[in-house]
């Protein structure tokens, strides 16, 4: 009987004490002592008036004050807060149940930073997104490795991205600084990737198409013109200008074009090779064709530094693109004036498709002449509706893949008007 009664009384007393201590009530305030973490977290304290820690009346204000001051609880005997060791802060504040030593605040996160402000962690794996773009949204708190960007391509918006090019003039003529009137700013060719005004520096070129080593990823031969030809930009080169063409040194079968009307086929800069070299892996076919790779440093194929470019099997235009009269027209080139495949492209890249008549205003010219014929045959014009054959009785629209034979020896371009 007594044996059954004692445990029941003890249990009743324990329950009573538990209910009494868990009730909210006045708890002792010890301003010089640390705050009671259990009280701060729950508003209750099982020790009641015998607790030796501080119990501030306004718990929310105490939590906010602790976070603002950077004061975090020190709990000797408890595991150290890893987030506190890395960053020097703790989102749980005074309610965190781990140990926060003041002398180790952020000591684990004190790593060396690269020139862009990202952490260098040689023992960790490299951040793939950073290797491709040069940016990392996690900043200096990222746990991955961010190597120095010495071999990376950085987006330098608003800076001069093209090197200074010397004008192909006579030795006695002034250089770029004094002879800026002999230069022209070549506008960018419209592209679906270039929407709106560009914040990049404009491409400065002289009146002739200048060959600059390293600008293009393929070895095309680009011609330049003599000072006599620079003064005659309002004329179209034909068979009567053979003497001037010989002095200018233009090469290729379609060199009788006004150089001021020739678009630049490639906007590429000479840069360090950022693509990985993996001799034991197959070669990246896209890189071998274009010299670029969208996967960057994370590509698993081989990217040889010295790319063996096969010799072209056709005549190249002055901007280094293949001339294949019997093949369909390169659609991308016909729209934007560039071709990423360079001399390895299997389509035709005629030069006359982008020849403008600078003698008359562009507003008076509804279309652009395309490989006109002096023998009275139908000529093609490139208008807003596409390719139109305008020399016939009824103009008809042509597809970009349709080709028409060019009479032999007829490689002149007729000025419109």
UniProtKB/Swiss-Prot annotation:
SMART domains: ZnF_C3H1 (SM00356). Disulfide bonds: none annotated. It holds the Pfam family zf-CCCH. This is Zinc finger CCCH domain-containing protein ZFN-like. A zinc finger (C3H1-type) spans 31-58, 75-103, 121-149, 278-306, 324-352. Signal peptide: none annotated. It comes from the Eukaryota. One of its GO terms (cellular component) is nucleus. PROSITE patterns: ZF_C3H1. Keywords: DNA-binding, Metal-binding, Nucleus, Repeat, Zinc, Zinc-finger. It is found in: Nucleus. Residues 383-417 are annotated as: Disordered. GO terms for molecular function: DNA binding; mRNA binding; zinc ion binding.
């Amino acid at each position: 009987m007594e044996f059954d009664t004692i445990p029941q009384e003890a249990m009743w007393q324990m329950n009573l004490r538990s209910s009494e201590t868990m009730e909210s009530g006045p708890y002792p305030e010890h301003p010089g002592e640390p705050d009671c973490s259990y009280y701060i977290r729950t508003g209750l304290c099982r020790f009641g008036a015998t607790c030796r820690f501080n119990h501030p009346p306004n718990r929310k204000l105490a939590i906010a004050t602790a976070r603002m001051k950077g004061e975090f609880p020190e709990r000797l005997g408890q595991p150290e807060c890893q987030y506190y060791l890395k960053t020097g802060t703790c989102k749980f504040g005074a309610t965190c149940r781990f140990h926060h030593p003041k002398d180790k605040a952020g000591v684990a996160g004190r790593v060396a930073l690269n020139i862009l402000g990202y952490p260098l962690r040689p023992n960790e794996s490299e951040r793939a997104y950073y290797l491709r773009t040069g940016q990392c949204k996690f900043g200096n708190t990222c746990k991955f490795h961010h190597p120095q960007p010495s071999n990376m391509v950085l987006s330098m918006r608003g800076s001069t991205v093209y090197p200074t090019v010397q004008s192909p003039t006579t030795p006695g003529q002034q250089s770029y600084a004094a002879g800026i009137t002999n230069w022209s700013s070549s506008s960018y060719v419209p592209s679906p990737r270039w929407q709106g005004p560009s914040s990049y520096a404009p491409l400065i070129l002289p009146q002739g198409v200048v060959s600059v080593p390293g600008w293009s990823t393929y070895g095309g031969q680009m011609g330049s013109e003599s000072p006599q030809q620079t003064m005659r930009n309002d004329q179209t080169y034909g068979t009567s200008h053979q003497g001037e063409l010989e002095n200018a040194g233009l090469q290729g079968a379609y060199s009788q074009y006004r150089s001021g009307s020739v678009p630049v086929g490639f906007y590429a800069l000479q840069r360090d090779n950022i693509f990985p070299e993996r001799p034991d892996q197959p070669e990246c076919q896209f890189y071998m064709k274009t010299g670029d790779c969208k996967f960057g440093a994370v590509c698993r194929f081989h990217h040889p530094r010295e790319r063996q470019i096969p010799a072209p099997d056709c005549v190249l235009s002055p901007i280094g693109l293949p001339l294949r009269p019997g093949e369909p027209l390169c659609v991308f080139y016909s729209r934007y004036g560039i071709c990423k495949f360079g001399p390895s492209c299997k389509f035709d890249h005629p030069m006359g498709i982008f020849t403008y008549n600078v003698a008359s205003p562009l507003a008076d010219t509804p279309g652009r002449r395309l490989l006109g014929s002096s023998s009275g045959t139908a000529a093609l014009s490139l208008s807003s509706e596409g390719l139109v054959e305008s020399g016939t009785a009824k103009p008809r629209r042509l597809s970009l893949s349709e080709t028409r034979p060019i009479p032999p020896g007829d490689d002149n371009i007729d000025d419109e008007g």
